[in-house]
């Protein structure tokens, strides 16, 4: 089940958490927060009624770079739920070359199993660490085989007092890191992997073949000489894998996939039929993708290698810029399956100022931390932040509006010289102010032709 600390969060708390990473777009945050809370509400209902309550899927409408994808990604992290992001343009109607839409659910099941397997390994980690220590101690202190019919397992359970004292001493040294550089010889499990190239649309077959060949090679091991420091994580991972019950993991993962899975479909507008385009082959293919998506969103059974997944209660969040098409250009059946529509607003200069400074991992904080690794202390004056936001807004207005992604382009250009010279400026402090910004970017901003190609 999802993390109990986050699954009981109220919509207000979810929005506050999203505010730490994403600037503005309050309506979209409210919509996803309510959708997430409704999942918790549904799980509190009696089973008979619970099965009747369907998720209210969300359609996000807004230009590129305003936070559509980031909201969905942060929401999945927050919910600790199986999450997969796909582009609608990667899929084609059944019968055409391209990915089958059912692959979305198979990918979601894969993600869910990986998530729950890692959680199961965390739960048995302490036990796995003890087993790994025993393996290392056995390599350091081989037990003496004496007598006919010697049983090594019995000897392990009832060691002599002298052996026991020695193991206790070595275990203490091992935990203190005093033996990290000592080499030992171990039998390590071999992962038999094989690269299989498959043509477009046959990725699933390639995946099944890879799994088949890896299963054929499972159980094999090889002797390797490693330092204890390098061997310990390998042994912990191997022992944790032995302790985890794979059947329980798969059962829990499939249930979580069905009840808590989130699918984010980006660029849904690219498979909408353009109203003014007339009826042509491209439109037929696009409509076919929508019709193939429809059973997944409505609720159907999809076969995966872990078992059958029912999609009735999976939350679907679709997004698109809808520059050339309108939401009403989607087929009516699909429109009806996305009852909640949220319009995200284009970003302004004030939004850019906040994006540069407010989020937990704001862009300016990232660049300051990157250059600090070279010993350069970088700081941005407030007038520089204002000027950068103004430049990004101007360029977006004059050219294609790519939202907050414009800030990446502007900052990379601004710090180009400093990033190149950083290794030679160890110990220096650099303050970026409005004058520095104008010196580096002023000419580009004033010349529309230059800014079109460089910014």
Curated annotation (Swiss-Prot):
Record family assignment: Belongs to the ClpX chaperone family. HslU subfamily.
GO molecular function: ATP binding; ATP hydrolysis activity; peptidase activity; proteasome-activating activity
Protein's recorded name: ATP-dependent protease ATPase subunit HslU
UniProt binding sites for ATP: 23, 65-70, 266, 333, 405
Primary localisation category: cytoplasm
Location of the protein in the cell: Cytoplasm
Subunit structure, interactors included: A double ring-shaped homohexamer of HslV is capped on each side by a ring-shaped HslU homohexamer. The assembly of the HslU/HslV complex is dependent on binding of ATP.
InterPro entries membership: AAA+_ATPase, ATP-dep_Clp_protease_ClpX, ATPase_AAA_core, Clp_ATPase_C, HslU, P-loop_NTPase
Species this chain originates from: Xanthomonas oryzae pv. oryzae (strain KACC10331 / KXO85)
GO cellular component entries: HslUV protease complex
Role: ATPase subunit of a proteasome-like degradation complex; this subunit has chaperone activity. The binding of ATP and its subsequent hydrolysis by HslU are essential for unfolding of protein substrates subsequently hydrolyzed by HslV. HslU recognizes the N-terminal part of its protein substrates and unfolds these before they are guided to HslV for hydrolysis.
One record GO biological process: protein unfolding
NCBIfam families linked: hslU (TIGR00390), PRK05201.1 (NF003544)
Annotated S-S bridges: none
UniProt keywords, alphabetically: ATP-binding, Chaperone, Cytoplasm, Nucleotide-binding
One Pfam family cited in the UniProt record for this chain: AAA_2
């Amino acid at each position: 089940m999802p993390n109990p600390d986050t699954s009981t969060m109220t919509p207000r708390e979810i929005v506050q958490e999203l505010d730490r990473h994403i600037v503005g777009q309050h309506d979209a945050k409210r919509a996803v927060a309510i959708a997430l809370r409704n999942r918790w509400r549904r799980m509190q209902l009696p089973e008979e009624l619970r099965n009747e309550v369907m998720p209210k899927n969300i359609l996000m409408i807004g230009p590129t770079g305003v936070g559509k994808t980031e909201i969905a990604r942060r929401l999945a992290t927050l919910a600790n739920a199986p999450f997969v992001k796909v582009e609608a343009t990667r899929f084609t109607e059944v019968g055409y070359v391209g990915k089958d839409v059912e692959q979305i659910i198979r990918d979601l099941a894969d993600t869910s199993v990986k998530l729950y397997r890692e959680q199961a390994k965390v739960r048995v980690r302490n036990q796995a660490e003890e087993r790994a220590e025993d393996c290392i101690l056995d390599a350091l202190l081989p037990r003496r085989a004496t007598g006919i019919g010697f049983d090594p397992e019995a000897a392990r359970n009832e060691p002599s007092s002298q052996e026991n004292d020695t193991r206790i001493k070595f275990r203490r040294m091992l935990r203190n890191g005093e033996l990290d550089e000592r080499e030992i010889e171990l039998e390590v499990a071999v992962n038999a992997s094989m690269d299989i190239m498959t043509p477009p649309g046959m990725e699933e077959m390639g995946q099944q073949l890879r799994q088949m060949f890896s299963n054929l090679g499972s159980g094999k091991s090889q002797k390797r000489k490693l330092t204890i420091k390098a061997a310990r994580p390998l042994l912990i991972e191997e022992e944790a894998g032995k302790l985890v019950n794979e059947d329980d993991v798969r059962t829990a993962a499939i249930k979580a996939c069905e009840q808590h899975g989130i699918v984010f479909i980006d660029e849904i507008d690219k498979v909408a039929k353009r109203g003014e385009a007339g009826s042509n082959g491209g439109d037929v293919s696009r409509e076919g993708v929508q019709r193939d998506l429809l059973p997944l969103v409505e609720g159907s059974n999809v076969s995966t290698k872990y078992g059958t997944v029912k999609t009735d209660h999976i939350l679907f969040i679709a997004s698109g810029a809808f520059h050339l098409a309108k939401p009403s250009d989607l087929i009516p059946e699909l429109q009806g399956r996305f009852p909640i529509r949220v319009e995200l607003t284009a970003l302004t200069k004030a939004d850019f100022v906040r994006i540069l400074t407010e989020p937990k991992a704001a862009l300016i904080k990232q660049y300051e931390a990157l250059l600090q690794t070279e010993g350069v202390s970088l700081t941005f004056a407030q007038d520089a932040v204002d000027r950068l936001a103004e430049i990004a807004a101007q360029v977006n207005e004059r050219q294609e509006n790519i939202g907050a992604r414009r800030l990446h382009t502007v900052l990379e250009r601004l710090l180009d010289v400093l990033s190149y010279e950083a290794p030679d400026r160890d110990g220096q402090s650099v303050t970026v102010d409005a004058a520095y910004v104008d010196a580096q970017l002023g000419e580009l901003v004033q010349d529309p032709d230059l800014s079109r190609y460089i910014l």
